[in-house]
């Protein structure tokens, strides 16, 4: 992360006040680097576990996850702060997190993730690399949705099976 133990790093956080507590942060380059380096070592094919129409979706090994957790932990702390603000209430007991799944999607043109849900209490998405042509295409998009390469979050009171894969 950083070489200096006491060095404070400023992280900009955007919050979205609807449904669940949703935040947006930009991760540090060293975290991004370790995620990419470890993803290149992935051998487990995750396609059978995921909703994506993506040719390459791979799971991180336990060894890789052990390397990644120290980089991820500070962001869980940031989320905790935001969640307490969102609830307008301090935790009675600080939550403990278990990383039950971690994978990387290597998404190419014309591949996509359809609407789907994730199990567990907390879920996150990290964009490790966005091609410049896609950034340009998104910037030029005139519609009302998130546009090319964007991400959309849906929330509702219905059960998990409200998303159909038929």
Q: What is each residue range found by the language model?
A:
Residues 2-96, 101-113:
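Non-heme Fe(II)/2-oxoglutarate
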């Amino acid at each position: 992360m950083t070489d200096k133990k006491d060095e404070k790093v400023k992280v900009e956080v955007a919050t979205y006040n609807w449904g669940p507590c949703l935040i947006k942060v930009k991760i540090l380059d060293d975290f991004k680097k370790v995620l990419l380096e470890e993803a290149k070592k992935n051998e487990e094919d995750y396609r059978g576990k995921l909703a994506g129409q993506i040719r390459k979706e791979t799971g991180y090994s336990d060894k890789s996850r052990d390397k990644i957790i120290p980089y991820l932990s500070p962001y869980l702390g940031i989320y905790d702060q935001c969640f307490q603000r969102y609830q307008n209430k301090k935790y009675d007991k600080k939550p403990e997190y278990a990383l039950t799944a971690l994978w990387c999607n290597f998404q190419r043109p014309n591949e996509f993730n359809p609407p789907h849900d994730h199990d567990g209490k907390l879920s996150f998405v990290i964009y490790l690399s966005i091609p410049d042509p896609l950034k340009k295409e998104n910037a030029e998009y005139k519609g009302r949705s998130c546009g090319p390469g964007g991400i959309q979050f849906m929330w509702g009171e219905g059960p998990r099976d409200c998303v159909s894969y038929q």
